[in-house]
């Protein structure tokens, strides 16, 4: 699958140019729309008929700032592991193949949340998330009320849980720019840091993991602050079903990217790539 053809390649191999009518009998499917109902609203349909050029999707991610601040001090790693994110740390930084992700999006069906491949249907499962990243897939869901708070209120919460209050310019509504978290890590952890300071540093790393990697969005550089209160008690953070939240984010990102009008995609795409590459 890593070297698979996209639909624009299929047109080329068949000698069909973008401005050439599709030969009779050649149909992109589906023939029956009882289940597969997206029709013309799917990226694959638009590429097949030459309505879009089939350019690669822009893969948005913002986790480099996190990996640039590794290895992480052992005293901080202990709390990250306690929160259930040790497997993500062990996976390390991985490049994302934009062509592979784009080809997979062309084969993704929002109606069934599966990839339609020549060999049949396939998808990413909770078991994949658990095995590859060690994220918890049982327990309470990652949900909550997105309560509006002023910048001053969020600043006080950041001071308590992260050990610093970001400048006003780093806030974007109820989101925080990831750059300020990475800059906070530029100052090394003192050798005599207290237990509370180690916990605060661990929360900074976890927010970078969530906003830049596991639950990233197309902003490419912001994390919703609604995650921060969930990180207050690191002993209970690992009980949440972060694996379910991660998989739901991936599904939503794939469904959104099938829209022909979309040019970018975000989410835990490294997971998708790792799962897909063995299928060749």
Question: Where do the model's predicted regions map?
Answer:
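Hydrophobic/basic alpha-helical segments enriched in Actinobacteria
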Residues: 129, 255-258
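Acidic, serine/threonine- and proline-rich low-complexity regulatory regions
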Residues: 257-265
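Short, well-ordered loop/turn and helix-capping segments at boundaries between secondary-structure elements
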Residues: 135-138, 256, 277
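Flexible helix-coil junctions and inter-repeat linker/turn elements that act as hinges
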Residues: 215-219, 259, 280
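A glycine-rich phosphate-binding loop feature that marks nucleotide/adenosyl-phosphate handling sites
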Residues: 268-274
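N-terminal leader regions that mediate targeting or early regulatory function
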Residues: 1-251, 267
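Cationic, amphipathic, low-complexity alpha-helical segments enriched
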Residues: 274-280
